[in-house]
UniProtKB/Swiss-Prot annotation:
Family that this chain belongs to: Belongs to the peroxidase family. Peroxidase/catalase subfamily.
Alphabetically ordered keywords of this record: Heme, Hydrogen peroxide, Iron, Metal-binding, Oxidoreductase, Peroxidase
Entry's pH dependence statement: Optimum pH is 6.5 for catalase activity. Active from pH 4.5 to 8.5.
Protein name: Catalase-peroxidase
EC number(s) from the headed UniProt entry: 1.11.1.21
Chain sites annotated for binding heme b: H263
GO cellular component: cytosol
Entry PTM: Formation of the three residue Trp-Tyr-Met cross-link is important for the catalase, but not the peroxidase activity of the enzyme.
Length: 720
């Protein structure tokens, strides 16, 4: 036998399996991976593909017709309940959109992420892999003109229409990602659906849910249908429902409407032994081809399917939109029972036979009704009960509130209406869309810049104000940004991070310039920052004119939901070297989070930090990280001095360091962890050394300008 016989020709571990990573060797090292996800190396479409343009070619009428036909085209390999896939498709859409949380804007239906781990294998998403496979022929037919994200969101909407609901509308424009997100924190738990009393719980104190999470445990979309930690108690469950839905930007009325509307159709599946289900998709064998939860010992389909473990329908007619949910919930008394799969569920006492839904396969058989603990909360919680009673008495009002809430659920993470595409986009402006009126594009931009330059405002004031206006942008749900100039409105004008006194002084000047020139305040704020950068670059010997596109509008107080905007408050900003208070996460980790939400890369983050420091934009005017004797000049001094071995770095307090001359021990500068990480982290140091090079002084300026412009234009969807 030769030396190579019987041995794998591939070196084990390094490239094809999960090996010990750098992060595991050095768990305290800063992980920059969240800044390099979704790049072109994983995207097979190529740099010239533009989904927003491609989807405009979609034959929406034909697609709608195909989806309508699919709803009643039952397949033997996964039969439709009562011959209609509506309930399954609604659950598919709901569980895609329902991962959204308002705190950081992450999650939601906007990326098609349900195709990938962990979502494709969450316990709460059991058997949704079958729904996506049922949709595959439609995706295959319409190809690049229809993303998975749009199709998944649209399927539930058409399902409702096919069952009799007049929907509020629909917008296309969601672009697919091609691998799981690395930036979404789903929770601290290390197992699926553990009790909240376990170690690594997301709850503290009096059932206080960790931010930014909007689900009660790992693997569930919202709440446990059996009750808190699987223990039925509708009033306790009502608390969980209220918290999780509020964190998804839904009020009590929307919560009741979505709960009732979601359970007006379809059924729960638990007529079998859940222990007989095979592994989830990510753990399934290769021959299962990405399908999970397969029952290989029994049929496991149709009336014998097991999903949540609860068993039964909520209404007598589960394939049609009606008011049966409230009629059943409010008119019957309910008692706790166990499903065939052993799950807690509520069943009616002495139901009338005509109220019992028929079997999914045999219409001559009647099955019992069921309510989850969350459904019972709609009856037992006093506020939810009032809303339920109103909906019961006014079915038309219920249908309208639900249709609007469903539209909000499926579009909350799409951003402003400028991103909406398709023939069914509603004309009505909705407050949660953060509407912005169109701005003036026809004014003398240079005249505005000249007035700004002559205003007497400092470079620091100009740049800081523009940055503060733009930094609220979140690429996760496309909210925030400089467009709208909401920095001049409540609540933003009073945020500590925006230095209200300085902001008021600068805005008073810039608003006057806007009024005199016909430009929007939003445009003038951005132009002010550009003027400051151009002046600083000129002082450094680089003549450059920053790109600028007029047309931002000015939002009004009436167009601004102050409560909704509160979540955009910057409680930390490493770019301005500021923390509102101490946090469990390190300052540099918080910087990465803001950078990722801004849609920036690690090199862009690096060059922006270096530039903003020497421009003197620190919050409160602190000098931490201002490694230059030429403040206000756009030099690469931050990087030159950071990488200079003539200096020694010493701790001088919590998140504070002194930079001392090695020979004299004289303190030269002070710094924070955010400053020093650009010299301590090996990747960031590589970028810092690049910008510290003698031949890259002009490159530094031009790269800073490019990154700055990217932030200023991040929310300009009208330019796409």
């Amino acid at each position: 036998m030769t030396a190579t016989q019987g041995k794998c020709p591939v070196m084990h571990g390094g490239a094809t399996t999960v090996n010990i990573s750098t992060a595991e060797w050095w768990p305290k090292a800063l992980n920059l991976d969240i800044l390099s996800q979704h790049d072109r190396k994983t995207n097979p479409m190529g740099p010239d593909f533009n989904y927003q343009e491609e989807v405009k070619k979609l034959d929406v009428a034909a697609l709608k017709q195909d989806l309508q036909a699919l709803m009643t085209d039952s397949q033997d390999w996964w039969p439709a309940d009562w011959g209609h896939y509506g309930g399954l498709m609604i659950r598919l859409t709901w569980h895609a959109a329902g991962t959204y949380r308002i705190a950081d804007g992450r999650g939601g239906a906007g990326t098609g992420n349900q195709r990938f781990a962990p979502l494709n294998s969450w316990p709460d998403n059991t058997n949704l892999d079958k729904a996506r496979r049922l949709l595959w022929p439609i995706k295959q037919k319409y190809g690049n003109k229809l993303s998975w994200a749009d199709l998944i969101a649209y399927a539930g909407t058409i399902a409702y229409e096919s069952m009799g609901l007049k929907t509020f509308g629909f917008a296309f424009g969601r672009e697919d990602i091609w691998h799981p997100e690395k930036d979404i924190y789903w929770g601290p738990e290390k197992e699926w659906v553990p009790p909240s009393t376990n170690p690594n719980s997301r709850y503290t104190g009096d059932r206080e849910l960790e931010n930014p999470l909007a689900a009660v445990t790992m693997g569930l979309i919202y709440v446990n249908p059996e009750g808190v930690d699987g223990n039925p108690d509708p009033l306790k469950t009502a608390h969980d429902v209220r918290v999780t839905f509020a964190r998804m930007a839904m009020n009590d009325e929307e919560t009741v409407a979505l709960t009732a509307g979601g359970h007006t159709v379809g059924k729960c599946h638990g007529n079998g032994n859940a222990a007989l289900l095979g592994p989830e998709p990510e753990g399934a064998d290769v021959e299962d081809q990405g399908l999970g939860w397969i029952n290989k010992t029994q049929s496991g389909i149709g009336r014998n399917a097991v999903t949540s473990g609860l068993e039964g329908a909520w209404t007598p007619h589960p394939t049609q939109w009606d008011n049966g949910y409230f009629r059943m919930l409010l008119n019957y008394d309910w008692e706790l029972k166990k499903s065939p799969a052993g799950a807690w569920q509520w069943e009616p006492i002495n139901p009338r036979e005509e109220d019992l839904p028929v079997d999914v396969e045999d219409p001559s058989i009647r099955r019992n009704l069921v309510m989850t603990d969350a459904d019972m909360a709609m009856k037992m919680d006093p506020e939810y009960r009032k809303i339920s009673e109103r909906f019961y008495q006014d079915p038309a009002y219920f249908a309208d509130v639900f249709a609007r809430a469903w539209f909000k659920l499926t579009h909350r993470d799409m951003g402003p209406k400028a991103r909406y595409i398709g023939p069914d986009v509603p004309q009505e402006d909705l407050i949660w869309q953060d509407p912005i009126p169109a701005g003036n594009r026809n004014y003398d931009v240079q005249a505005v810049k000249d007035r700004i330059a002559a205003s007497g405002l400092s470079i620091s004031e100009l740049v800081s104000t523009a940055w503060d206006s733009a930094r609220t942008y979140r690429n996760s749900d496309k909210r925030g940004g400089a467009n709208g100039a909401r920095i001049r409105l409540a609540p933003q004008k009073d945020w500590e991070g925006n230095e209200p006194d300085r902001l008021a002084k600068v805005l008073a000047v810039l608003e006057g310039i806007a009024a005199a020139t016909g430009a929007s305040v939003a445009d003038v704020i951005v132009l002010a920052g550009n003027v400051g950068v151009e002046q600083a670059a000129r002082a450094a010997g680089v003549e450059i004119v920053l790109p600028f596109a007029p047309g931002r509008g000015d939002a009004t107080a009436e167009q601004t939901d102050t409560e909704s905007f509160a979540v955009l408050e910057p409680i930390h900003d490493g770019y301005r070297n500021w923390l509102k208070q101490d946090y469990a996460a390190t300052p540099e980790e918080l910087l990465l989070d803001r950078t990722q939400l801004l849609g920036l890369t690690a090199p862009e983050m690096t060059v922006l930090i270096g530039g903003l420091r020497v421009l003197g934009t620190n919050h409160g005017g602190t000098k931490h990280g201002v490694f230059t004797d030429r403040e206000g000049v756009l030099t690469n001094d931050f990087f030159v001095n950071l990488t200079d071995m003539n200096y020694l770095w010493k701790p001088a307090g919590k998140n504070l360091y002194e930079i001392c001359d090695r020979k004299t021990n004289q303190v030269k500068w002070t710094a924070t962890r955010v400053d020093l990480v650009f010299g301590s982290n090996s990747i960031l140091r590589a970028y810092s050394e690049l910008y510290a090079q003698d031949d890259n002084k002009e490159k530094f300026v031009r790269d800073f300008v490019a990154a700055w412009t990217k932030v200023m234009n991040a929310d300009r969807f009208d330019l796409d």
